[in-house]
Amino acid sequence: MEGKVIIFSAPSGAGKSTIVNHLLGLHPEFEFSISATSRPPRGTEKDGVEYYFIDADRFRRLIAEDAFVEHEEVYEDRFYGTLKSEVERIWAKGNVIIFDVDVKGGVNLKKYFGSSAMSVLIVPPSIEELERRLVNRGTDSPEAIAERVAKAGSELEFAKGRFDFELVNDDLQKAFEEIEAKVDGFLCA
């Protein structure tokens, strides 16, 4: 292990990207770990910026080559993972790695990095609020939203007791203040 990592996990739509982007704006020494995915880009997403977009066949080859710290088939033929080369790239610059991953990915990353990592589970105030956020995001079909909402309950159940800290994202300003204090404590430890 070389440096520290902060892992953010949540069901889709819980607000983890908003919180991660807030922290990245406050801390120039933080760097976002770009995940790899086999899903197609949404909207204006660009390869190498939001994600490394890799087709499912190539993703499977990289898994076979042990190129990932962690990976997960989140939906059929929809893979997400953290490339070892991405971790090496960020640590080579002396930066703190920020992960924005699904719940299973967060648990796997915490196991991999151990005490070098702080893992944070971001929780929506309710499943109904999560569904409202996904609808308002406007990037997914009604079928995809229903699938994500159904998955959220099982993800939250799986996550119980597996994260260092749970942040309820109800009031965004309060969530920012709470996570800033936790991050400062972790970095000073």
Where does each model-flagged region fall?
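Pre-Walker A (Motif I) flank of P-loop NTPase domains
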Residues: 2-6
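P-loop (Walker A) phosphate-binding loop of NTP-binding proteins
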Residues: 9-11
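ATP-binding Walker
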Residues: 14
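Walker A/P-loop
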Residues: 17
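Post-Walker A helix-loop "phosphate-sensing" segment adjacent to the P-loop in P-loop NTPases
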Residues: 25-33
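ATP-dependent small-molecule kinase phosphotransfer cores
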Residues: 37-97, 104-107
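Conserved phosphate-donor/acceptor-positioning beta-strand/loop module used by diverse small-molecule
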Residues: 97-102, 112-136
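Small-molecule kinase domains that catalyze NTP-dependent phosphoryl transfer to phosphate-bearing small molecules
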Residues: 139-182
